[in-house]
């Protein structure tokens, strides 16, 4: 089947959810009532939902069947042990704590690592800096509410939509070491390797880069946590683009990559394909003290550490989903679907970030050059796209990045992107064609799209619940 121009979806659709069609007038009223924030729309008013791929896709029949094996014991559940075995087999990590989702893991490990650094290295809490190739929004939020600065050290080409590169998600290694020295190694409680790098456009990180980051971290005795939401997509890109690993399986690449971290935090709602679930895992006995403290904190914040806020059936489903998300044919289809959408958008003159793993990222700054960054061009584009076609997408730009907690000033954003996030096994090529046609209509009226200003601005993670209005 290799000689066909386009292969169809490698699955059969057995259950469907009807969606309603709405009028332009209806959608204009809906987005206005939502405070010009697509997050606040009701899902029944959305025709194609590209807000996120987090827990919004279909699951496999094997995952559904696994739920019936659930052991709902409060402690010592056999479903927990099934999940822990899967983690050890796939990642090589000894210690597993389930959580309700990724941010559940973050709210546990971040304060524990800060406390450990303070106790062992004399960390100065007034000078704390955590580093990443690019923090996911909730990771940044949890870092900041623990009074730690979140600093991103990405490469120069990462946000340049005019540049093609194999691994645009990589750390800038020189900037990483410079940032460590500027803060003082004792004041860096952790480094987060985000794979794939969501905010840069779902761009992958090479094993060579992960290894180099880990070597730098070990030099200064700084723990590395792998933000693992899209670990399988990252492994697929490594297989396709990093010469040394072209003949390796996804499973082999994954095991190799996770040698270069001390722990992992995962929103399992992405590559593990579940609707709800997360993981916090540590590699070996060198982090047993951290694991022990995290288990204690888990009881307070998530639940007993052998269920972590998940029912037994959900842990069984997650154990299967970790494997199902690594299937070669599945990953090839998923990455090709994103590439098809990006190519279609660029064919009509809509500039995008290089095709990445889970979404097409439209360069809203170039599509709406008349809207300045402080009026959130990508968010304005999201509102216009909804008005035109009922498509919900999400801004990855100045609105998401937020303000400097110390000064209150808007953080400078390297790019104003609109993320069209594709849920797993949910939308077909016909949907992609509809999205492309919708952008043709948006592009024709682009000069009339207005910037936005706040009517309500939350202090943290403002993009989720902010309310805005169009500038006069």
Swiss-Prot record:
Keyword annotations of the record: Lyase, Pyridoxal phosphate, Tryptophan catabolism
Protein's UniProt keywords contain Transport: no
Enzyme category, top tier: lyase
Any one Pfam family match given in the protein's UniProt record, by short name: Beta_elim_lyase
Cofactors demanded by this protein: pyridoxal 5'-phosphate
Residues the record lists as N6-(pyridoxal phosphate)lysine modifications: 270
Gene3D superfamilies given in the database record: Aspartate Aminotransferase, domain 1, Type I PLP-dependent aspartate aminotransferase-like (Major domain)
Keyword flag Cell membrane: no
Record pathway: Amino-acid degradation; L-tryptophan degradation via pyruvate pathway; indole and pyruvate from L-tryptophan: step 1/1
EC number: 4.1.99.1
Catalysed conversion reaction: L-tryptophan + H2O = indole + pyruvate + NH4(+)
GO molecular function: lyase activity; tryptophanase activity
InterPro entries: ArAA_b-elim_lyase/Thr_aldolase (IPR001597), Beta-eliminating_lyase (IPR011166), PyrdxlP-dep_Trfase (IPR015424), PyrdxlP-dep_Trfase_major (IPR015421), PyrdxlP-dep_Trfase_small (IPR015422), TNase (IPR013440), Tryptophanase_CS (IPR018176)
Subunit: Homotetramer.
PANTHER family: BETA-ELIMINATING LYASE-LIKE PROTEIN-RELATED, TRYPTOPHANASE
Family listed: Belongs to the beta-eliminating lyase family.
Identification of the protein by name: Tryptophanase
Protein source organism: Vibrio cholerae serotype O1 (strain ATCC 39315 / El Tor Inaba N16961)
Gene designation: tnaA
């Amino acid at each position: 089947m290799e000689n066909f121009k386009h292969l169809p979806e490698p699955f059969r659709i057995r259950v469907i959810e009807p969606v309603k069609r709405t009028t332009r007038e209806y959608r204009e009223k809906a987005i206005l009532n939502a405070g010009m924030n697509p997050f606040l729309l009701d899902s029944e008013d959305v025709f194609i939902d590209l807000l996120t791929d987090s827990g919004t896709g279909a699951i496999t029949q094997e995952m559904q069947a696994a739920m019936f094996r659930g052991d709902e014991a409060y402690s010592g559940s056999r479903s927990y042990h099934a999940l822990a075995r899967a983690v050890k087999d796939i990642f090589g990590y000894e210690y597993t704590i389930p959580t309700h989702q990724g941010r559940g893991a973050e709210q546990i490990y971040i304060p524990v690592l800060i406390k450990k650094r303070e106790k062992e290295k004399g960390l100065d809490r007034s000078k704390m800096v955590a580093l990443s190739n690019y923090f996911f929004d909730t990771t940044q939020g949890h870092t900041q509410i623990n009074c730690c600065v979140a600093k991103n050290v990405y490469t120069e080409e990462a946000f340049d939509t005019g540049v093609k590169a194999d691994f645009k998600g990589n750390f800038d290694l020189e900037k990483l070491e410079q940032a460590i020295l500027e803060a003082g190694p004792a004041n860096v409680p952790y480094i987060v390797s985000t794979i794939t790098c969501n905010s840069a456009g779902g761009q992958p990180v090479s094993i060579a880069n992960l290894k180099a980051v880990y070597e730098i971290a070990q030099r200064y005795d700084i723990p590395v946590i792998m933000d693992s939401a899209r670990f399988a997509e990252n492994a697929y890109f490594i297989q396709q683009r990093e010469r040394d690993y072209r003949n390796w399986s996804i499973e082999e690449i994954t095991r190799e990559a996770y040698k270069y971290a001390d722990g992992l935090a995962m929103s399992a709602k992405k590559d593990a394909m579940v609707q709800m679930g997360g993981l916090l895992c540590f590699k070996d006995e060198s982090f047993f003290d951290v694991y022990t403290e995290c288990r204690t904190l888990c009881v307070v914040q998530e639940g007993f550490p052998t269920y972590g806020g998940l029912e037994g059936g959900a842990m069984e489903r997650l154990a299967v989903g970790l494997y199902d998300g690594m299937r070669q044919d599945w990953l090839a289809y998923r990455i090709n679907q994103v590439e098809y959408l990006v190519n279609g958008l660029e064919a009509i003159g809509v500039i995008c970030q290089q095709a990445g793993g889970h979404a097409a990222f439209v360069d809203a700054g170039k599509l709406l050059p008349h809207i300045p960054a402080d009026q959130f061009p990508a968010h304005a584009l999201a509102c216009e796209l909804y008005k035109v076609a009922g498509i919900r997408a999400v801004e990855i730009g100045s609105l998401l990045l937020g303000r400097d907690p110390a000064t209150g000033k808007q953080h400078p954003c390297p790019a104003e992107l609109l993320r069209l996030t594709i849920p797993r096994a949910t939308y077909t090529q016909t949907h992609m064609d509809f999205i492309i046609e919708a952008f043709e209509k948006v592009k024709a009226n682009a000069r009339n799209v207005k910037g936005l200003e706040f009517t309500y601005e939350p202090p943290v993670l403002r993009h989720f619940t902010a309310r805005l209005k169009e500038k006069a």
